[in-house]
From Swiss-Prot:
Alphabetic keyword roster: Acetylation, Coiled coil, Endosome, Golgi apparatus, Membrane, Phosphoprotein, Protein transport, Transport
Protein name (database record): Vacuolar protein sorting-associated protein 53 homolog
Species annotation: Mus musculus (Mouse)
Assembly, per entry: Component of the Golgi-associated retrograde protein (GARP) complex, also called VFT (VPS fifty-three) complex, composed of VPS51, VPS52, VPS53 and VPS54. Component of the endosome-associated retrograde protein (EARP) complex, composed of VPS51, VPS52, VPS53 and VPS50/Syndetin. EIPR1 interacts with both EARP and GARP complexes and mediates the recruitment of the GARP complex to the trans-Golgi network. Interacts with VPS50 in an EIPR1-independent manner.
Membrane topology: Peripheral membrane protein
């Protein structure tokens, strides 16, 4: 019973003394110890085994027990010492706390004494400085009074002097005095309630009014609205009067400027009246020459009279431009039928040159907000009549690289005078647009005539497959028209020009490209099987001649160039035209037209090679395959197909070297056309023996290898065929091989044969199965049981998908092919 109680006590003690791992780790860090008894994972059994490893060591058990007892007594002594030391800790803590509280109370008392002394010191300082503050206020008020009296004296004296000098027209002294009086008067705004101050202010306003009227009268006398200008240079009186006008109401200054400019341009209105011969567009140079002479005359006679900041030379030029625009608009409306395109362009050229002259000489600081709003913000200066660093040769080279008006340097600063006169020509730009319509029509006709005269590009030359030169000529002309028209207007005329561009892009596509594509002939339709099998290497089987193949490739390359450049043309037109009109620029229809030409060209190349291979496939289907006794080399029809591929494909590849993506498209289309046709003719080879099937399998493998190598066939540089093309060939020709493997398999037992068919052909349907049975030469009675077994072994297809798998793996329908072509063309457009 006692032993059980001791065990329970030990267990409870161990439970109480069980420490968490974190606490145990902290203890080990603070009190490191190597004693096994201090370890957290202490094991009494292991510890005893360590002390007594053998039975012989038990002889020393008394010594070990004595050592442990001695250690226990030592630990007990240490514990008692520590416990006794903790008995007085609470009392010592309370005593320390009381001492700290007393120290804090003493500190608060000292702080309160310091605060009281500071308040007493502040009160003493206020009493000492009270009298000094009153003296400061008195001094400040006295200073203000003296300053105000001085200002009042200055104002009164200044007003008297101002009135006297005004009567004597002493404008030089008035300019400085008036500014001083105005500055002094500002100090009295808060004293306007005082009658005397208000009276002085009214006298200043009256003097200003009198000065303004007097100065205007002096200018009217010097420069009368009617009559000739006063001879001689400007007087010092008027020069000083302008300085005074700078200080007066701005309306006085504007009135002086208006009257002077009106008088200065009065001669111009007389010389270039609507009924005068020099007023018409053919003599527009004389207008600009006249104003240039007037500007020189002004600088010599009146340059020093007006302050420089008035910019009188620029103001005269701007007013001249407004008057000229109005006069030209009026005369062109009256004589609209007499405007010819050469005359219009001549006038616009001279006008834009004059606007450029103004931009070089003046900053445009006098152009009012209304003027700036009225004149649309100009595009970058690309005036074709001004000096242009880009030569025509450079332009043509850039166009050959597919670049249209690519920016090569930072954008030039806008010309603030752009359109200030030339805007008047915009309503008459229909003459220019009609002229460009006529010129482009003649250009297209010339292209057609040149093509007929020079003929298609010659094979075996650098011309073969190259872009037609007429294409670059067309876009060079387009660029010149676009740049020129953007100088004339960036509004509706640009939209009209875009419509003209669209019209002749379509005509070029129809007349030059589509119109010159060779027509499919039927000359090879009379080839017989015997003649096909007897043909020698190098004989002509292709429907198109070498020249015609080169022509098709050249038209394809040209259409691709037109497609890319038309897209760039659309972007540049959107940059040139007003932002509000950009949505009306859309050349997608024209790009689709060129895409159609590309598709037609590729289709012709595919049809040509396809037609060349047709007789060989017909010969394959007519051969007596049931009589073949041994497997030899590839059959003659395979040799014929390979011969035609080796004849046509290298020519097409070399001529489409600059458009590899379309050569790849040609290869893909040919594979999609040839492989289904080959499988169709394969089903016609019936009946067929086992050896015949083996020969056909060998032929099929040979064709598969040739088709896989088709993109680089006959080329010195071997390139890996595109993955998309390889996938089509492998999928299609593997199906043909699987068909032949099924044909070669014995048809008994029936279950094994049917299962083998389902395993080899993924499109396992009854129609294909029956064709294979026909190839094996089985009778209809045998076929019916096998077909029934096939229907039983086939898994039920999902609703609505029956037959669809067959269609998807047989030749694609025209709709599917057309859809695929459209998707590919859209992808090409995006990448371009």
């Amino acid at each position: 019973m006692m032993e059980e109680e001791e065990l329970e006590f030990v267990e409870e003690l161990e439970a109480v003394l069980q420490l968490t791992p974190e606490v145990q780790l902290a203890i080990e860090q603070v009190f490191p110890s190597q004693d096994p008894l201090d370890q957290a994972d202490f094991n009494a059994v292991e510890y005893i085994n360590t002390l007594f490893p053998t039975e012989q060591s038990l002889a020393n058990i008394d010594d070990v027990v004595n050592k442990i007892r001695l250690k226990i007594r030592r630990l007990d002594d240490n514990i008692r010492t520590v416990v006794r030391g903790q008995t007085n800790v609470g009392q010592d803590g309370r005593q320390a706390l009381e001492e700290a509280q007393k120290a804090i109370q003493q500190l608060f008392g000292k702080i309160k004494d310091i605060k009281d002394k500071a308040e007493k010191s502040e009160q003493m300082v206020k009493e000492i400085t009270r009298d000094i503050k009153q003296l400061d206020h008195a001094k400040r008020h006295l200073t203000t009074s003296i300053t105000t009296l001085n200002h009042l004296h200055m104002l009164a004296g200044g007003v008297d002097s101002l009135e006297a000098m005004t009567r004597r027209r002493q404008y030089g002294e008035v300019a400085n005095l008036l500014q001083g009086v105005m500055n002094v008067l500002e100090h009295f705004h808060k004293y306007m309630g005082i009658p005397q101050i208000r009276q002085l202010s009214e006298r200043v306003k009256a003097a200003q009014t009198e000065l303004g009227q007097q100065i205007l009268a002096d200018f009217e006398e010097a420069f009368p609205s009617q009559g000739t200008k006063r001879p001689g240079g400007p007087s010092n009186v008027l020069r000083d009067a302008c300085l005074v006008a700078n200080i007066l109401d701005p309306r006085i200054k504007q009135e002086i400027i208006k009257k002077f400019i009106k008088q200065h341009l009065s001669e111009y209105l007389v010389l270039f009246q609507e009924n005068q011969d020099v007023a018409w567009l053919d003599k527009i140079d004389r207008r600009y020459a006249w104003v240039k002479r007037q500007l020189v005359d002004y600088e010599e006679k009146y340059g020093r009279m007006f302050p420089r900041e008035w910019c009188m030379t620029e103001r005269i030029s701007v007013e001249f431009c407004h008057v000229t625009r109005a006069e030209l608009s009026k005369i062109m409306r009256a004589r609209a039928k007499e405007i010819e395109v050469k005359l219009l362009l001549f006038a616009i050229q001279r006008t834009t040159n004059f606007e450029g002259f103004l931009a070089k000489r003046f900053s445009g600081c006098t152009l009012t907000d209304g003027t700036l709003k009225k004149l649309e913000s100009p595009p970058p200066s690309t005036n074709p009549f001004l000096e242009d660093e880009t030569t025509p040769e450079m332009e043509e080279l850039a166009l050959e690289k597919g670049e249209l008006e690519q920016p090569k340097k930072p954008k030039a600063p806008d010309n603030p005078f752009h359109g200030i006169v030339s805007k008047c020509f915009e309503p008459h730009l229909y003459v220019y647009i009609e002229s460009q319509d006529k010129n482009l029509s003649e250009l297209i006709d010339r292209f057609v005539a040149d093509f007929k005269a020079q003929g298609p590009p010659k094979p075996n030359t650098d011309e073969g497959g190259a872009v037609l030169p007429s294409c670059a000529d067309l876009f060079v002309y387009y660029k010149k028209c676009m740049v020129q028209c953007s100088q004339l207007s960036t509004g509706e005329p640009m939209i009209a020009l875009t419509t003209i561009f669209q019209k002749y892009l379509r005509e070029y596509a129809w007349k030059i490209l589509s119109g010159n594509l060779p027509k499919t002939s039927s000359s090879s339709g009379g080839l017989t099987i015997s003649s096909l099998l007897k043909e020698k290497e190098g004989s002509e089987v292709a429907r198109f001649t070498l020249e015609e193949l080169c022509l098709i490739c050249s038209i394809l390359s040209t259409a691709e160039y037109c497609l890319a450049t038309t897209q760039q043309l659309e972007e540049k037109l959107k940059e040139k035209v007003d932002v509000s009109l950009t949505e009306r620029i859309n050349l997608t229809g024209e790009m689709d037209t060129f895409s159609t030409v590309i598709s037609s060209s590729i289709q012709l190349l595919v049809q040509d090679l396809d037609a060349a291979c047709d007789p060989a496939l017909i010969a394959m289907s007519k051969m007596p395959w049931q009589n073949v006794e041994h497997v030899g080399d590839q059959s003659p029809y395979v040799t014929s197909v390979i011969l035609h591929i080796k004849q046509n494909v290298p020519i097409i590849r070399d001529n489409l070297a600059s458009t590899r993506k379309y050569f790849t498209q040609f290869c893909i289309k040919f594979a999609n056309s040839f492989i289904p046709k080959f499988i169709t003719h394969l089903f016609k080879c019936k009946p067929i023996s086992m050896v015949g099937a083996e020969q056909l399998l060998l032929d099929t493998h040979s064709l598969k290898m040739v088709l896989l190598d088709l993109p680089s066939i006959g080329s010195q540089v071997v390139r890996k065929a595109p993955a998309s093309y390889t996938k089509i060939v492998v999928k299609g020709m593997t199906r043909a091989e699987m068909i032949l493997k099924v044909v070669m398999a014995p048809h008994e037992p029936l279950v094994v044969f049917v299962d083998n068919y389902i395993k080899l052909l993924t499109d396992c349907n009854s129609e294909t199965f029956q064709k294979i049975l026909d190839m094996k030469g089985l009778k209809r009675s045998e076929q019916s049981s096998m077909l029934e077994l096939l229907r039983q072994r086939l898994p039920a297809p999902p609703s609505g998908t029956e037959g669809s798998s067959t269609l998807s793996l047989i030749a694609p329908t025209p709709e599917q092919e057309s859809s695929r072509i459209r998707k590919l063309e859209k992808l090409i457009k995006k990448r371009l």
